[in-house]
Amino acid sequence: MKTTYTSKAARAALALFTALPTSTAYAANGTFFYHSPQSGDLEMEDPDNGECRLLLQGADSALNQTDTKATLYFDQGCEEPAGTLLPGQSKSFGAPIPHSVQFG
């Protein structure tokens, strides 16, 4: 009977584990603020982790008020890193300015 109980517990744990979403499914909690030279102050609320997000007309400054690191990129496709902002960090950028961001 002990083997049956252990087996049931193991199957239940496995079912629970496989039902959990992967890390890319999570959203960063909080707001990412940035300033675009042409568009002014903008923000992203609870952005998805792992998704490359366009910064409208680029960002000359950014503030990461999410609970996840934000990696900024000079290009629009998240391929040319411009720097990383940990939760609570901010940064101003000179030329060239970042044009995309990815969380996680």
Predicted regions and their residues:
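Compact beta-sheet-dominated domain cores in extracellular/mature segments
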Residues: 2-104
